Design a protein with these regions (language model features):
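Short, amphipathic alpha-helical "lid/cap" segments that border enzyme active or binding sites
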Residues: 29-36, 40, 93, 161-168, ...
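Hydrophobic alpha-helical
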Residues: 1-3, 68, 80-81, 85-147
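Hinge/cleft segment of the Venus flytrap/periplasmic-binding protein
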Residues: 56, 60, 71-72, 162-204
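Short, solvent-exposed amphipathic alpha-helices that sit
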Residues: 31-36, 59-77, 91, 95, ...
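Structural recognition of the beta-strand scaffold that forms the well-ordered cores
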Residues: 7-12, 25, 48-52, 81, ...
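Flexible loop/hinge segments that line or gate small-molecule binding clefts
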Residues: 1-30, 34, 41, 48, ...
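Solvent-exposed loop/turn segments at secondary-structure junctions
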Residues: 14-17, 29, 55-59, 85-89, ...
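Short, hydrophobic alpha-helical segments
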Residues: 39-44, 100, 171-179
Length: 204
């Protein structure tokens, strides 16, 4: 389409090459790194972490992993268990059951999305260990991650903005013949117990 002079807006996931008019999306690597730094702060730079990954064949999964690892660099935090839960809550619960069976000391679970973090919480709750660890997810949808933080299930969730409104606004600009940037990076917020009632805190 792009080579035939038809404008193309790429939303959410990066594509190979430059055959598009505008890419709109958040920076998953930056979000993962912010999560890593938040986790390092909460654990005072040391502890045992379980990482439940999204589909690692996808760029969001890869970026949320590499960003997180960068965020905990230079700390004594150990990732003692990691598994690909394919973005699915039941898979995350199953993987967390394995982690709980293998490790007595788990300080925090970092999941690449909120359903993953919730699945891990349910697994820990089933063994009466949910109070022994913290749970962190990504996406921060109002009815999901943000609601879980308000209920005290998750300790934090990092927003992944979907960019629908920005995509429509960009499409209208293109139709009006206005120029648009090649890349629009959307900002993100963290919602934790300290700020969730105030609408979260913007990431720098």
């Amino acid at each position: 389409a792009y080579t035939n002079k038809i404008p193309v807006i790429v939303l959410d996931r990066r594509v190979v090459g430059e055959d598009y008019t505008c890419f709109i999306g958040a920076d998953n690597k930056k979000i993962g790194e912010a999560a890593g730094r938040w986790i390092a702060g909460k654990l005072n730079g040391k502890g045992n972490v379980v990482e439940l990954k999204g589909l690692m064949t996808t760029t969001p999964g890869q970026d949320r992993n590499s960003g997180f690892r960068k965020g905990i660099e230079g700390t004594e935090i150990k990732v003692i268990f990691e598994a690909d839960m394919k973005w699915l809550e039941p898979e995350a619960r199953k993987e967390m059951e394995s982690a709980l069976a293998r490790f007595d000391q788990i300080d925090l679970v970092y999941a690449h999305n909120d359903p993953g973090a919730h699945g891990a919480y349910l697994a820990a709750q089933a063994t009466a260990r949910e109070k022994q660890m913290k749970f962190v997810g990504i996406d921060a949808l109002p009815h999901e991650g943000v609601a879980y933080v308000k209920k005290g299930i998750l300790d934090a969730t990092f927003q992944y903005p979907t960019g629908g409104a920005e995509a429509v606004a960009t499409a209208l600009k293109i139709l009006r013949g206005e120029s648009v940037p090649k890349k629009i990076v959307l900002g993100s917020r963290v919602f934790d117990k300290a700020n969730v009632e105030q609408g979260g805190r913007e990431l720098p």
